[in-house]
């Protein structure tokens, strides 16, 4: 009777139009209910039955209803699903398969089936790549996915590596070598094989791409020669290997092993500056004045060199510090090490005065067993030998930035513009509230930024430094010159790691064009997008594998009395994030572990402090002691508790 009633249809349409709607992102919880977050400002409750239609992270449009004075969101339309391609663990019951996504807030199994081309017989515990196919808000009965690739079985000790690489869609293997001969015969190379070049690396390094040699000019100045491996002598632009390297963009360094950008025969052999082997290189020569100033005589050329010694960071540092048993193999090598130390001291002094020097932070290295188990985590402090190489590489990259800018006006540049102009007022307010005079306009200039950084570095704690970091931009890759505020330099273009960075290979080709006087073509902007995206993915992969290994390493210590010194790196509404100083692991301290009465405590990201009854008890950058309360292996989260 009411079926074709136009009045009823009109009423329905009216109700539909009048029902308030909001667009937002679903936030799941471990308790079955969820919230719809709108513009990060307002959130609406989603009851458990309605959460069955959506997934954490989905962007949806929902209708709003009021139930017992509470506004409730009812999911209506899917705008953008959270999951498309994902990795997870397969469950098999009888002959039915489902997959649980590997994500902290996605606990429910999704029904799935392998695509036709996939012949693997999936078992419970297997890891797989999947693609979402069905979603309840698209009119489907439930969630459904296709299994598109088998990653490995659940018993594989190397699950952290294989799953992480699959998650970020990164290569597992080195590229395959194709027949490659030295081809740039028309490039005149000077013979520098008689000079005492040395390499300084870790003991295990095989892909040595830089060698150094210094000559004392006798007037307080030094002539530094930096020789860099020349893979573009073997890899033609747009050749098969070049396209592979362009796609990979970087060698991917993960705990325990690396996946090279170029075939190992090139990276670890033909191009590697091995001792007593004649190698083609690009060379930069520059005079360094007694005060560390780079001379105007920057000169690039192609050459042959022969490294006279493969030196190791710790051994060189020990020798310079007068400790350990190691000795240079002869007086020539000893002289080179001593001269390199002079280069380092002069350049470091110049950069402290005229640019910016990063504070030394330790590196953490996982010592792994044959089954991928973590035997130990070694803290590697940056010592004098590390600083020698760093200063020489920075000098070389400044020289390249100048040569490319003055001769071509383009290249692959690392650019960092300091404060975000939209946030600089807020940065100035935070500084002024903490007793540091700051003019927002001055902070946007390179001298103003450098002056502020030097002031912050001289303060007794890093509290203020960590507070204003969020108002700064990220470093970018650009095809035109621009300042690098983070280094305090007017221009910076890297060319010193062409075996492991594709952008450096591009700069090599441009430098060769300058050397030979040939026409050079400006790199396409698309290449900077690819480099930035790959750098992001590689960093995420390194972090993900690290989190997994930290969880494995710290799990036996959960619930014990073992104490760890830690630094507070972030304050959130829910608690504190800390870094364990002995091993580099990041842990979370939930607010209830800090103080039992929630109403008496304020955890403020705005001020970077935790206050109890109005008193500040913790601040960002504070050093505290913690115990490991729990390690959640399925999410690789470490939960800590402060030692009171």
Curated annotation (Swiss-Prot):
Residues 189-516 form the RNB domain. It catalyses: Exonucleolytic cleavage in the 3'- to 5'-direction to yield nucleoside 5'-phosphates. Signal peptide: none annotated. It comes from the Bacteria. Pfam families: OB_RNB, RNB, S1. Keywords: Cytoplasm, Exonuclease, Hydrolase, Nuclease, RNA-binding. This is Exoribonuclease 2. It comes from Yersinia enterocolitica serotype O:8 / biotype 1B (strain NCTC 13174 / 8081).
């Amino acid at each position: 009777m009411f079926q074709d009633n136009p009045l009823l249809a009109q009423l329905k349409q009216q109700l539909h139009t009048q029902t308030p709607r909001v667009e937002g992102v679903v936030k799941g919880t471990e308790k079955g209910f969820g919230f719809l977050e709108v513009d990060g400002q307002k959130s609406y409750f989603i009851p458990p039955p309605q959460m069955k239609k959506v997934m954490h992270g989905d962007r949806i449009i929902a209708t709003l209803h009021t139930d017992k004075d509470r506004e409730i969101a009812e999911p209506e339309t899917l705008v953008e699903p959270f999951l498309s391609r994902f990795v997870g663990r397969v469950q098999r019951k009888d002959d039915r398969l489902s997959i649980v996504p590997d994500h902290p807030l996605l606990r429910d199994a999704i029904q799935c089936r392998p695509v036709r081309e996939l012949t693997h017989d999936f078992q419970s515990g297997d890891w797989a790549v999947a693609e979402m196919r069905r979603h309840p808000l698209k009119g489907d009965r439930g969630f459904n996915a296709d299994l598109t690739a088998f990653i490995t079985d659940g018993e594989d000790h190397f699950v952290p590596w294989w799953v992480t690489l699959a998650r970020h869609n990164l290569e597992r293997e080195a590229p395959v070598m194709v027949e490659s001969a030295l081809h740039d015969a028309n490039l005149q190379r000077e013979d520098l094989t008689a000079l005492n070049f040395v390499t300084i690396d870790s003991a295990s390094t095989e892909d040595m791409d830089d060698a150094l040699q210094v000559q004392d000019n006798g007037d307080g100045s030094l002539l530094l020669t930096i020789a860099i491996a020349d893979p573009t002598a073997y890899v033609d632009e747009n050749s098969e290997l070049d396209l592979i390297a362009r796609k990979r963009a970087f060698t991917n360094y993960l705990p325990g092993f690396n996946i090279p950008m170029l075939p190992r025969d090139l990276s670890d052999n033909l191009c590697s500056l091995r001792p007593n082997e004649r190698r083609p290189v690009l060379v930069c020569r520059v005079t360094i004045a007694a005060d560390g100033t780079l001379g105007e005589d920057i000169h690039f050329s192609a050459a042959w060199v022969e490294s006279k010694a493969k030196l190791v960071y710790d051994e060189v540092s020990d020798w310079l510090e007068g400790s350990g048993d190691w000795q240079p193999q002869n007086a020539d090598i000893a002289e080179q090490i001593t001269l390199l130390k002079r280069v380092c001291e002069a350049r470091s002094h110049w950069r402290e005065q005229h640019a910016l020097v990063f504070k030394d932070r330790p590196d953490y290295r996982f010592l792994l067993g044959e089954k991928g188990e973590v035997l130990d985590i070694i803290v590697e402090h940056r010592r004098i030998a590390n600083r020698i190489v760093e200063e020489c590489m920075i000098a070389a990259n400044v020289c390249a930035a100048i040569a490319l800018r003055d001769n071509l006006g383009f290249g692959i540049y690392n650019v960092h513009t300091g404060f975000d102009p939209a946030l600089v007022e807020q940065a100035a307010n935070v500084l002024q509230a903490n007793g540091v005079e700051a003019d927002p306009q001055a902070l946007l200039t390179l001298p103003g930024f450098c002056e502020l950084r030097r002031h912050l570095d001289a303060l007794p704690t890093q509290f203020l430094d960590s507070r204003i970091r969020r108002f700064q931009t990220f470093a970018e890759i650009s095809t035109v010159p621009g300042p690098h505020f983070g280094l305090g330099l007017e221009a910076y273009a890297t060319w010193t790691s062409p075996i492991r960075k594709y952008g450096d290979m591009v700069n090599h080709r441009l430098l060769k064009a300058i050397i030979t006087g040939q026409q050079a073509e400006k790199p396409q902007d698309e290449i900077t997008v690819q480099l930035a995206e790959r750098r992001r993915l590689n960093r995420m992969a390194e972090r993900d594998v690290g989190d997994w290994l930290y969880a494995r390493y710290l799990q036996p210590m959960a619930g014990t009395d073992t104490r760890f010194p830690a630094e507070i790196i972030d304050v959130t509404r829910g608690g504190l994030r800390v870094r364990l100083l002995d091993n580099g692991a990041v842990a979370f301290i939930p607010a209830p572990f800090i103080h039992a009465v929630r109403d008496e405590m304020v955890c403020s990201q705005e001020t970077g402090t935790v206050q109890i009854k109005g008193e500040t008890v913790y601040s960002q950058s504070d050093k505290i002691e913690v115990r490991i309360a729990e390690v959640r292996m399925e999410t690789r989260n470490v939960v800590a508790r402060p030692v009171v």
